Amino acid sequence: MPRIKRGNVAVKRRKKILKRAKGFRGTHSKLFRVANQQVMKALRYAYVGRKRKKREFRSLWITRINAAARLNGTKYSSVIHSLKESKIAINRKMLAQMAVADPDSFVKVLSSAKAS
């Protein structure tokens, strides 16, 4: 049985890791073992960050809606409650966008939710 040398495969694997570690500081981008650890850590942070981003944006939207609602003399919880009662299906992202970009339409949505 012939001897199989895996030089090509190993080099490609290391180059792939070092390419991913580009931009890291010092030995974190030069030495394979350290770079490999840092790439794995970075991938874990990236995964967690993608989950955290959803939470942070939702809380940002809620804060913006609450601020706009308080300018109009009401609270966030009562706004959401009145929207649900009047069966107005608009999500928090759209409400927050409306509150920032077009406050007049936000007030109209609030008044229509309160009216019904």
Swiss-Prot record:
Coiled-coil ranges (or none): none
Cellular component terms per the entry's GO annotation: chloroplast; ribonucleoprotein complex; ribosome
GO BP, sorted A to Z: ribosomal large subunit assembly; translation
Keywords assigned by UniProt, alphabetized: Chloroplast, Plastid, Ribonucleoprotein, Ribosomal protein, RNA-binding, rRNA-binding
Keyword rRNA-binding: yes
Cellular compartment(s): Plastid, Chloroplast
Principal location class: plastid
UniProt key word Ribonucleoprotein: yes
Listed Pfam families: Ribosomal_L20
GO molecular-function term, one example from the UniProt record: rRNA binding
Function: Binds directly to 23S ribosomal RNA and is necessary for the in vitro assembly process of the 50S ribosomal subunit. It is not involved in the protein synthesizing functions of that subunit.
NCBIfam families reported for this sequence: rplT_bact
Family indicated by similarity: Belongs to the bacterial ribosomal protein bL20 family.
HAMAP family documented for this protein: Ribosomal_bL20
Protein name, per record: Large ribosomal subunit protein bL20c
The organism of origin for this protein: Rhodomonas salina (Cryptomonas salina)
